[in-house]
Amino acid sequence: MKRMLINATQQEELRVALVDGQRLYDLDIEHSGSEQKKSNIYKGKITRIEPSLEAAFVDYGEEKNGFLPLKEISKNYFPENHIETLGFNIKNVLQEGQEVIVQISKEERGTKGAALTTFISLAGSYLVLMPNSPKSGGISRRIEGNDRIALKELLTLLELPEEMSLIIRTAGAGKSIESLRWDLSLRLQHWKTIQIIAKSRTAPFLIHQESNIIVRAFRDYLRQDIGEILIDNPKILDLARKHITFLGRPDFVNKIKLYSGEVPLFSYFQIETQINSAFQRKVRLPSGGSIMVDSTEALTAIDINSSRSTSGTDIASTAFNTNLEAVDEISRQLRLRDLGGLIVIDFIDMSAISHQRAIENRLREIARDDRARIQIGQISRFGLLEMSRQRLSSSLGESSHHICPRCTGTGTIRDNESLSLSILRLIEEEALKENTYEVRAIVPVEIACYLLNEKRDAVHAIEKRQAGGKTIIVPSKKMKTPHYSVSRIRKSESKNYTRYGLSNIRQSKITSFLKKNLLKKKQKEILDVANFNFYDNCYNKIQEAQENILKKNNYNNILLKVLSNNRNFIFKMITWFKNSFFIKNMLITSDIFKKNTLKNTNNIFFKKKYSSLNKKNNNQKKRVILSKLFEANIENIPLKNKKLDTSSANYLYDNIERKKNITKKNDLIQKNIHENSYLKHVLMNRYNVINIINNNYIFYKIFNRTKIFKNQNTNNSFLKFSSVTSPIFIFSSVFSLELALGKVWIKYPIAILDETKKQKKLNRKQILHISSISETNTIVNKNNYSGIKKIKHETYSFKKYVKNNIQNQEVTQSQLIKRTKKRNVFILDKKNFLYKRTCNRKNKIHQSSAPITKISKQSDLNKKEKEFHYNLSMMKSSLRGKNSAGVHSATNFSNSPVSKLK
């Protein structure tokens, strides 16, 4: 009994086999990555017309353009006034850029593109519709006798549109007129759908794709003699039943069964060995003979050998029986391998003409069962028979094999001795050329051993003939015969010597060792901030962790370490480039630092006064406290000293303190601000980024914005003032990596400061002509009573708000501020910026009679005086006041009362 076996256990490969008992007679294999393209319908565009070939090249959406000959162009594309009797040039039929509907008639092979046709054919279960071929109708040649006569009568009853034709397939034999009409209606509807899709889009694109292997198997292979269809996959079983019903073959639904045996389906029917024979060059015959199958670009050659065959009584009978046995196996191998094109068979010599005719008749008889069209010739006087077979799809070898990289498809390679002598002659030829400095030959190890041992004298003679030239032979383990490389180096070219494989290995090991050591040096131990738990005792724990960090590391290396914590490569690159830009624009060279910065001093960023004193709260003593627990022990930070753009607002850095000033001199840790409250509002703020610095300190990266400052320009000069006290605002501000990202959102706390009556009285006695800056960005002169009254009113309102809101009395958080990248920076010392009365007289001693705007002498900057401790970046106001002698305009300073802190 004949069966159809479908193996679908492996999703990468689907196999369909037709067996007669346990003999395999047809096979179809489809791989997941190489679906069949034949019979696919595309809308293509003419890219080039070649009159010499009478053909056109069509772009249909694949890598290689398709080949469309003139004979495969339908008359629908011909001009209306053409005459059939006259010859037509393809240039008069098609034009470049014209869109056509084409179907693939032959698959791509090697470097050749697919063969195309405009004569579309739509295959169904019982018939094939050809919508633009009016003269191609007929009945399958396999249908004979009464069935053929009956089908001719049924063809006249089918209603077919004009300029269309159809072919009744072998499966249509014995079918009723209703079945044929149903199949025809499906094909007509399919053609209408193709035309609608083709008009909807421009070329190139795929219109219709040929069905998968299961649908093709049911459509092409199902015949009445198939008694059973076995499938070893339940999912494919359900799919097969749906397809077979849709194809109009309900008589086969009950024949579909699920195979659930423990032994694989193909192994159970013992056909795996027969399938493997389709991949081999040599196929054994039952009598002991063999056939050899060799495929080339031009044709497929099949040779028959008797070998140890003893099937006959004499030589003639043995040759005849072996050839007769080979004919059956050849026809089977042609179907299994799906070989197409020209095929030449070399039979064993037979002197009897009757034997030759018997072989030809047997081959024609077997070919009738083949789906492909086959044309068979006669055995020539040389014992060769020529035949051609229709190429239905890519052969099994083309879809499953690849060219051998060593022999490049020839099947043989040159022996070592012959190859060595050929390389030696090539070296000698290259050495004889003029201006040759060196000839290098990279060869396999076997060839190198032969040349350096057996042909040592010949190589030495070539070097002598070079007159100072060199001949270098390098063995390569990676290279196998017959591959080699011979190159010629001229005297003017670079002379980088080719090294042996061992040297390359050593060099790679050395470089990898050095890279590891460099990485170890660069990637020092970094404190993981994510593992910290900030609670009441967090400050002590942070101090303990700081002791394990290496000290005095460069700021650039610190940034690299922070970046190395992030595993995202893209984030690293973006942050690195932006941070480099930040350092380049913010940190200046040591030369500029020496000119404009006092030695042995630490600088902080200064912000001007926000509120004035209130008479009602004279006895209260509150100070602004933000960064009371952390300090930055940075000395001589170089910052770029240039005129900064302050068109929008002044953004200041401040509160970088020494630890000694925090713990000893400055009374920053007050009863008003508790440590837990500070940690809650600052440390646990998710907008603040904590960075652990190896210089034994920790600081926050925050930027503050003030709306109090009036738009001003800075000058490239610094002045020295004595140490005096004054009520000021200290905002938490530290460098941030997030500055490199362009924008930062920050929260920062503030508190209020009031001084005593005694301090107010001392402030009123100050001689310096100074003025105050209000919240509305206006400068208020001390004689402007209305302005001072307005400031006091605003201050009183603010004090009243804080007093009513007890929770906000200690710490008041400002709103979130969006921080852009370009900002203004000023540097000042972070000590109490206040004036003493005694310092005013000393300042007058150092003042000249003529006003100056810049200190030009470096010696003045290097003077050491006990009373001078600060660097001040002066800000020039748009309102011009009377300049004091020896300094900038004093209108840039606060007019608020100043006094000494107790």
UniProtKB/Swiss-Prot annotation:
- One term under GO cellular component: cytoplasmic side of plasma membrane
Membrane-crossing ranges are none
Biological processes, Gene Ontology terms? mRNA catabolic process; rRNA processing; tRNA processing
For binding Mg(2+), which residues are annotated in this chain's numbering?
A: D303, D346
What is the cofactor note?
Answer: Binds 2 Zn(2+) ions per homotetramer. Binds 1 Mg(2+) ion per subunit.
Please give the PROSITE patterns that the UniProt record associates with this protein. S1
The prosthetic group or cofactor this protein requires is: Zn(2+); Mg(2+)
List compositional bias (Polar residues) regions by residue number: 889-902
How does the annotation summarize its subunit structure? Component of the RNA degradosome, which is a multiprotein complex involved in RNA processing and mRNA degradation. Within the RNA degradosome, RNase E assembles into a homotetramer formed by a dimer of dimers.
Sequence similarity: Belongs to the RNase E/G family. RNase E subfamily.
Q: Please give the function described in this protein's UniProt entry.
A: Endoribonuclease that plays a central role in RNA processing and decay. Required for the maturation of 5S and 16S rRNAs and the majority of tRNAs. Also involved in the degradation of most mRNAs.
Could you tell me what this protein is called?
Answer: Ribonuclease E
